[in-house]
Amino acid sequence: RKQWAQRWARGFESYYFRQSNYEREHMPSVFLTSDTHFGHAGVCRFLREDGTKLRPWDNPDEMDEEMVKRWNETVRPNDKVYHLGDVVINRKALSTLSRLNGDKVLIRGNHDIFRDDEYRKYFRELRAYHVMNGMILSHIPIHSDSLGRFGTNIHGHLHANRVMLYNENRSQYGLENTYIDTRYHCV
């Protein structure tokens, strides 16, 4: 599980599982993605901690078109996609979802505020979370007290940030007090 999560964490905004080239050609792949924020002008202005832009586009129309293009170059119509929330920011952008390949499941995020029937036009399932292969998929990272039975939480919401641990005892050994919690992996 840990080795898979490390490989996955190095991916771009999604990752697919594949066993062989034959399976990739003949069997559906599984993709995870999150925080597409279709239609969101503000996300084009978000900055990383180092001051660089989180997304390279200047406006949401340009961003949406390029993301749809990249999605459909990667995801085939029969592939399964778990979208871990914050799919669109406004109703106008909902229609963008009809252009996306894949059998899609939405794990609802804090910006997914529209009625269920508005999302069901584009997603086969709507969920609060999903358990898969001993991992829990969610939008917001789950509380660490609930993580024990899963081991790993694949989530969205944090964009370029990571879940950190604080340990006051580490400073007595000259180590940083905060460090990355490797049980969490942000898409």
Regions found by a protein language model. Name each.
Residues 12-17, 22:
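Aromatic (phenylalanine/tyrosine) cluster motif
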Residues 22-187:
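Catalytic phosphate/metal-binding cores of nucleic-acid and nucleotide-processing enzymes, i.e., regions
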